[in-house]
Regions:
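Sensory coupling linkers of modular signal transduction proteins
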Residues: 2-11, 105-135, 319
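Terminal output helix/cap of sensory domains in signal transduction proteins
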Residues: 59, 63-93, 349-355
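Active-site-proximal, acidic helix/loop segment immediately C-terminal to a metal-coordinating Asp/Glu
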Residues: 202-220, 305, 309-358
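Conserved acidic
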Residues: 3, 120, 195, 316, ...
C-alpha cells in the first residue's frame, strides 16, 4: 500500500510511466484519479480535490468518496486484472457520476494501475428520473382514460327486437375505434361504428367528441344522412389540421317497421347483412369527416329487415390484419367465416385474426353484431 506522497512525487511518477500529460489532467473539468493494484489513489487531479474538499492521494479509493468498505463491484480491480476498460455509475455526495476505468501500463507493458475518469451526469440522471416519474403519471392517466373509454361502450344487450354483441380490442392503451347504440325515440334505435385516424390520446379524444356529438344530434335529427351532415358541421368548427379525420357508418333501425336506414362517411369497411339464406354488403358512397371540404352532403339508403337478419359492423383493423408475408385478412375472409359459421361469428372472426396476424397487433379493431331477434 502506498503512503500519501507530495505532488512533486506524483508528477514524477506520471512522467516516469508516461501516463498522461499532467497539465492536461489538471485542467480537465472531469474528475481524474489513478489507483494502484492495492486500491490506493496515487494521483488525483485538481478538479477532484477541490470538489471533494481534500487531498485524496494516499487514501483507499472507496474511502475518498465516503464509503466504509470496498465496492461490491470494483471496476479498478477488474480493469487491472483483465486489462479491460470498465464503466459504471456512482453516486457521490448526492451527485451522479459515470465512472470509466482504463488500465495503465508501464514501459514493459505490465498493467500496474487504473486511471479513472468521473464525469458528472447528475443533470442527465435527474432529467431521466423526472421523465420516469412523468411517464408513470402518464401511464396512470392513460389507464384511467382507458377504463373510461371501455365503460362508455354500449352494453351487450337486447334492445326490444334487436340484440347487440361485440368484440373490442385496441392496439394501444387507448383506441381510435368507437361504436355506440342508443334509443333515438320510441320507434328508432341508432347504431354507428367509427374509426379515427391514428392511435393514442388524440384519437381517443376524437372518439369522445363523436360519441357526445352523436348523442346530442339524435335529439333533433333522425335521418342518418342529415345526422352525418350535422356531425360534419360541428366537426369543422374544431378547426383541426387536415390530417385529423375519421370515418363513420351510421344506421337507424325502426323497431316497428323493421326499416333500416343508413349513411356512410368514408367508412371503407362495409357492413355485412346476412341471414341463413343470403349475404350482402350495405354499400353506399360518402366522404370521410375531413376538413378538405367546405361542405359534405351524404346519401341515404334503406333496407327492410326481418327476424333472423344480422348486420356485422367492423373496422379496418380486421380486414387489414397482415400475416407473415404481408397478406391482409380481407373482407373475403370475413365473408367465408360467415358462410361456414352461422353461430359465434364474432369469436370465430377474432380467433382467425389471431391466427392470421404476424407480430404485434398494429391497429385497433372492433366487431359489432346487430341481430333482429323478434
Amino acid at each position: 500500500m502506498l503512503e500519501k506522497e507530495n505532488l512533486n512525487y506524483v508528477e514524477k511518477k506520471i512522467e516516469e510511466y508516461g501516463m498522461l500529460n499532467y497539465h492536461v489532467l489538471e485542467g480537465m473539468a472531469d474528475w481524474v484519479r489513478v489507483v494502484d493494484g492495492d486500491g490506493t489513489i496515487i494521483y488525483a487531479n485538481r478538479t477532484m480535490k477541490e470538489s471533494l474538499g481534500k487531498d485524496v492521494v494516499g487514501m483507499k479509493c472507496y474511502k475518498s468518496h465516503g464509503k466504509k468498505k470496498p465496492c461490491s463491484f470494483c471496476i479498478t480491480e477488474r480493469s487491472i486484472s483483465t486489462g479491460e476498460i470498465v464503466q459504471k455509475e456512482e453516486k457521490i455526495n448526492g451527485r451522479y457520476f459515470s465512472v470509466k476505468s482504463s488500465p495503465v501500463t508501464n514501459s514493459e507493458g505490465k498493467v500496474f494501475a487504473a486511471v479513472e475518469v468521473f464525469r458528472d451526469v447528475t443533470r442527465e440522471r435527474k432529467l431521466e428520473l423526472e421523465l420516469i416519474e412523468k411517464n408513470k403519471k402518464m401511464s396512470k392517466d392513460l389507464g384511467f382514460a382507458k377504463r373510461i373509454q371501455e365503460k362508455i361502450l354500449p352494453n351487450k344487450e337486447k334492445l326490444d327486437n334487436i340484440a347487440i354483441d361485440y368484440i373490442y380490442r385496441p392496439s394501444e392503451m387507448l383506441s381510435g375505434d368507437m361504436f355506440d347504440v342508443f334509443y333515438i325515440d320510441d320507434e328508432n334505435i341508432g347504431i354507428y361504428i367509427s374509426d379515427v385516424s391514428g392511435h393514442g390520446v388524440a384519437a381517443a379524444m376524437m372518439t369522445m367528441f363523436i360519441r357526445q356529438t352523436m348523442r346530442s344530434i339524435k335529439d333533433d335529427i333522425v335521418s342518418p344522412s342529415a345526422t352525418l351532415s350535422e356531425l360534419y358541421r360541428r366537426f369543422s368548427t374544431l378547426n383541426l389540421d387536415v390530417d385529423k379525420y375519421f370515418t363513420i357508418f351510421y344506421g337507424v333501425f325502426n323497431k316497428k317497421t323493421y326499416e333500416f336506414k343508413y349513411s356512410n362517411a368514408g367508412h371503407n369497411c362495409i357492413p355485412i347483412m346476412y341471414n341463413k339464406n343470403k349475404m350482402t354488403t350495405l354499400e353506399i358512397k360518402g366522404y370521410p369527416m375531413t376538413l378538405l371540404f367546405d361542405e359534405i352532403l351524404y346519401e341515404e339508403k334503406n333496407i327492410k329487415l326481418s327476424k333472423g337478419d344480422k348486420i356485422l359492423f367492423y373496422t379496418d383493423g380486421i380486414t387489414e390484419a397482415k400475416d407473415k408475408s404481408g397478406k391482409e385478412f380481407g373482407i373475403e375472409s370475413v365473408m367465408k367465416i360467415i358462410e361456414s359459421h352461422k353461430e359465434n361469428i364474432l369469436n370465430e372472426i377474432n380467433n382467425n385474426i389471431v391466427i392470421h396476424s404476424w407480430g404485434e397487433q398494429q391497429d385497433d379493431f372492433a366487431l359489432v353484431l346487430m341481430e333482429v331477434i323478434k
